[in-house]
Amino acid sequence: MRIKVLIPNSGMDRKTLNARETMLSRAVSTETEISVDCIQSGPVSIESVTDEVFAGPLLLQEAIRAEREGYDAFVVYCFSDLAITALRENVDIPVIGPGECALAAADILSNKFCVITTVEGNVSRTYRRLMQNPITQKKLSSVRALNIPVAELRDDPDATCVYLKKVCAEAVAEDGIDTVVLGCLGLA
């Protein structure tokens, strides 16, 4: 099986992409080939609806190319699952949205959960989107921000991890949650 993973951020270097490929390859069988790339132009990160709109057509081109090249599935490497409905309309291979997957797992595992996103500007947008889903509206307690932009998450991984633990602890104490969903794949 061959899976194409596309990060909807532009300008990522090959070393970073290879690191993601290695990380993801550890989670699949040895018979599965994972190929990770990013969009070649467009937004540097997905932090707004505008970023999603600009990245969407680029994702569509890449999904069509992946199907043409014989990939068995296409993964949009972003919690927002941007453009997955349009991608599914245009290709016959499965299109996977990690946000959908994470929220399905949270529904199964949790009584009450919190989504941790990157910046404060994403909180209300993410909350509104999640509250449109009948499954998440029952169990979503809150959406909280790290206040670290996507492009800076890996600048100081130790500091990001310390702050992430702090925000998670606050969500447990203040919101009574039992599960945390990371709302950015840059936190993986």
Ranges and model annotations:
Residues 19-32:
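A short, Lys/Arg-enriched amphipathic alpha-helix followed by its capping loop at the start of a domain
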Residues 48-65, 159-167:
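Glycine-rich, highly charged phosphate/nucleotide-binding loops
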Residues 1-17, 113-117:
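Short beta-strand segments enriched in small/hydrophobic residues
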Residues 6, 68-78, 176-184:
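Periplasmic-binding protein-like
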Residues 88-109:
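Short, acidic/small-residue loops that bind anionic groups at enzyme active sites
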Residues 121-122, 129-183:
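Active-site rim beta-loop-alpha module in soluble metabolic enzymes
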Residues 35-57, 151-156:
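N-terminal beta-loop-helix "entrance" segment that forms/cooperates
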